[in-house]
Design a protein with these regions (language model features):
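Glycine-rich, Arg-bearing micro-motifs that act as flexible, cationic patches
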Residues: 110-133
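A short acidic, glycine-rich active-site loop
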Residues: 53-67
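Short, flexible loop segments at boundaries between secondary-structure elements
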Residues: 137-145
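Conserved beta-strand positions in the Rossmann-like core of class I SAM-dependent methyltransferases
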Residues: 34, 84, 140
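Structural beta-alpha unit
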Residues: 74-108
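Small/aliphatic-rich secondary-structure junction motif
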Residues: 3-52
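Short, hinge-like loop/turn segments at secondary-structure boundaries
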Residues: 51-54, 102-104, 126-128
């Protein structure tokens, strides 16, 4: 029986499905839910073209990730579930693992979309694959096509 579930939520189609599955598991088990939205690290003071990093862009991204998280929390609330949530900044796998340890999660739920072609898989990598290797607890990978 799960007591604490951590959902890494990004608002994507696979994230939406993970939210639905997480909702069902939490209802069934009476688990505490925590949602996190992981925002990538800013490029320090340099942009991709070597220019100065735009602080306004960083604030816009923070608002965007906060809106994604709030949408997930609202959907769970509408379904009668209480959940905590936070936006974190950093490497997705490191931040998810850290948060899972911090809240003593016994299940991490993530969405995953199968990518077509080896180049897409190589370029993008797989957070879920790396997470399975590093997670301090069980990981449920919700797959969409």
């Amino acid at each position: 029986m799960y007591q604490r579930i951590l959902l890494a939520y990004d608002g994507s189609a696979s994230g939406q499905q993970a939210l639905l599955d997480c909702h069902e598991i939490a209802q069934w088990s009476g688990s505490e839910l925590t949602l996190i939205a992981v925002m990538p690290l800013p490029l320090n003071n340099l942009g991709l073209e070597g220019g100065i990093y735009n602080e306004t862009l960083q604030e816009t991204e923070e608002r965007r990730y906060r809106a994604i998280l709030d949408t997930g929390l609202r959907k769970l609330g509408d379904a009668g579930l209480k959940a905590d949530g936070q936006v974190v900044t950093g490497d997705a796998v490191s931040e998810i693992t850290y948060c899972a340890q911090k809240i003593k999660a016994d299940l991490i739920v993530v969405g995953h979309k199968h990518l077509e072609g080896w180049a897409a898989r190589w370029w993008r990598g797989s957070v879920s694959k790396a997470l399975i290797e590093q997670a301090p607890c069980s990981v449920l990978v919700v797959i969409t096509h």
